[in-house]
Each structure stands twice: as C-alpha cells, then as structure tokens.
C-alpha cells in the first residue's frame, strides 16, 4: 500500500537521480576544460535518514552538486570519462527502478479504487 513516506522517498530518489544525471552531463561537457572540477550529487545518506525519521522528503538543497575532491590531471581537470560513464549507467538504472516502483504503487492504488 502506498503511504506518504514511500511516495516522498521515491519522489526524492528520482529527483536526486535526475540531479546526478545533470551533473554527469556537465562533467562530460567539460572533460577538456582546464581546471574544471567534476560535480557530484550525494543525496543517498540524507534520503536514508529522512526515511528513517518517517518523512522520506528531501529539500531541493539536498540535490545541489558539489565539487569532487578526486585527484586532478596535469591541466587541473579531474573528470574521468570511464568513471562518469559508469556513474551514468548506474544512475540511469536506479532512476528506472525507482520509477517502476512508483508505477507499481500507483497501479495498486488504481486496482484498489476500481474494486471498491
């Protein structure tokens, strides 16, 4: 059964994965830009704490990209195409899973409504 914590958590997760995809796109677009520092979005621990606290909702600030502290190359850039590609695949799959879970929850609600 769908509850507000579950819905909030799925919405927050999809927002976080979307922000992560945007950060990855920015990183790949700046792969040859001298002194560019890769961006990353770290929202998973905040989401886990929010769910544990009974909310599941996260503020927009939780999805703000931060600069990566990974070592830089000679030109001062720290974007790794292999790391970004793997992160893009992982994030896409996680977004897809959260989206499917939300769809399933809404389908159950619709079925219950039709039966009553």
Descriptions of predicted regions:
Residues 1-116:
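Amphipathic alpha-helical polymerization modules
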């Amino acid at each position: 059964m769908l509850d507000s914590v579950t819905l909030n958590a799925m919405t927050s997760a999809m927002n976080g994965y979307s922000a992560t995809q945007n950060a990855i796109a920015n990183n790949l677009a700046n792969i040859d830009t001298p002194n560019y520092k890769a961006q990353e979005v770290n929202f998973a621990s905040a989401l886990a704490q929010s769910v544990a606290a009974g909310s599941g909702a996260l503020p927009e600030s939780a999805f703000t990209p931060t600069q990566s502290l990974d070592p830089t190359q000679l030109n001062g850039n720290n974007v790794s195409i292999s790391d970004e590609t793997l992160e893009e695949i992982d994030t896409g799959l996680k977004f897809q899973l959260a989206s499917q879970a939300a769809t399933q929850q809404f389908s159950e609600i619709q079925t219950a409504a039709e039966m009553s």
